[in-house]
Design a protein with these regions (language model features):
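N-terminal glycine/serine-rich phosphate-binding loop of ATP-dependent small-molecule kinases
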Residues: 1-95
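Active-site core segments that coordinate phosphate-bearing ligands/cofactors
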Residues: 2, 6-7, 19, 105, ...
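Short, glycine/acidic-enriched loop or turn micro-motifs at the edges of active sites
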Residues: 12, 104, 120
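Residues that scaffold the ATP/ADP-binding catalytic core of kinase and kinase-like folds
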Residues: 95, 107, 125
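Carbohydrate-associated surface elements
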Residues: 101
């Protein structure tokens, strides 16, 4: 029985599910599902539609099931510069604000104000 591995790549304009397995000592990759993505304006902020992304991730996994190719593991890669704040019950607080939102202007310069020593002092447990 084949062992399948699912990689989900979520980019700024689209996402895709790539299913891989080994065949005759070589890795075989197959695109299973593709979906659109993009920032939206919501409450005056540029945000990601987290609900739509979650549904797209599930839809691609369901496609694997339809094909009878159930992955033994799943990895998800994103642009990795955005965040969502959670409350004490792990519920979202507000929108998933995108890195291109106006609130991030000048942040790279602000980050340079902290030397590695100062950052260590701030983050040390």
């Amino acid at each position: 029985m084949e062992r399948y591995y699912l990689a989900i790549d979520i980019g700024a304009s689209s996402g895709r599910h790539i299913l891989g397995h080994m065949e005759d000592g070589k890795m075989v990759l197959e695109e299973i599902y593709r979906f659109p993505n993009g920032m939206q304006k919501r409450d005056g902020e540029k945000v990601w539609d987290i609900e739509a992304l979650f549904e797209a991730v599930l839809a691609g996994m369901k496609k694997c099931r339809e094909l009878g190719k159930i992955p033994v593991s799943v990895g998800i890669d994103t642009w990795a510069v955005d965040f969502v704040l959670l409350d004490k019950d792990d519920q979202r607080i507000g929108n998933a604000v995108a890195y291109r939102d106006d609130r991030t202007k000048g942040m790279d310069e602000d980050c340079l104000l902290y030397t590695s020593d100062a950052a260590d002092d701030l983050t040390r447990v």
